[in-house]
């Protein structure tokens, strides 16, 4: 019902979900909805049920084409929000399960995690600490996925980042610095290809920076 009227596999449709602990369940529901949409489309166009082979091909096509992002960053849940549902170890395992499913089903256009510094900054971190914690979390996911036997170039393009931007001067370069550190580490430490070296991020204004009065900027 929620996505009625939306073609979830259209090239111009991308769904971003800010969900973390329940991410595996919500993501599974979303993927099944996208698959069901296309199965229903087949039935409407062909006036019959698809065969098992046709249904399998439809599912594979959907997973290869669906676009979006699921936040699913359990590490910042612990560091910045204190809203952990499961232990860190179990959560990393489940996140690894998601990424392994993406690899096995060629899910290339969906970000399996949005590694989030925003919430860490809102909890009190300055720009430098935000960047340090966020990249550290990113490398933690990389090491966890590599330990499960996944190849760096099979999963690194599915990783995205989320940074806070405020009034501190360091925010003017946080994106460039993050991209530089990530690219160098991906290339030199992990032997990743050019696509995997690209750090893709979203940013938005820091909520805690929006003060009605701030002496540092209003004393002139």
Q: For each of these PLM feature ranges, what is it?
A:
Residues 213-214:
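Extended amphipathic alpha-helical segments with heptad-repeat/coiled-coil character used for oligomerization
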Residues 182:
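Conserved, mostly hydrophobic/aromatic
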């Amino acid at each position: 019902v929620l996505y009625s009227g939306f073609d979830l596999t259209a090239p111009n449709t991308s769904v971003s979900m800010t969900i973390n602990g329940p991410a595996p369940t919500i993501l599974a529901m979303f993927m099944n909805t996208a698959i069901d949409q296309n199965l229903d489309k087949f039935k409407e166009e062909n006036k019959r049920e698809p065969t098992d082979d046709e249904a399998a091909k439809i599912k594979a096509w959907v997973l290869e084409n669906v676009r979006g992002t699921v936040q699913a960053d359990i590490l910042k849940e612990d560091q910045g929000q204190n809203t952990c549902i499961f232990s860190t170890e179990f959560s990393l395992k489940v996140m690894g399960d998601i990424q392994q499913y993406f690899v096995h089903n060629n899910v290339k256009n969906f970000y399996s995690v949005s590694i989030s510094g925003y919430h860490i900054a809102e909890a009190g971190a300055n720009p430098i600490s935000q960047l340090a914690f966020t990249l550290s979390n990113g490398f933690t996911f990389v090491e966890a996925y590599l330990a499960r036997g996944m190849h760096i170039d099979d999963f690194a393009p599915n990783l995205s980042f989320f940074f806070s931007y405020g009034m501190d001067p360091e925010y003017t370069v946080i994106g460039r610095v993050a991209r530089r550190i990530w690219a160098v580490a991906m290339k030199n430490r992990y032997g990743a290809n050019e696509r995997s070296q690209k750090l893709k991020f979203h940013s938005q204004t820091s909520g805690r920076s929006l003060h009605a009065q701030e002496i540092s900027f209003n004393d002139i």
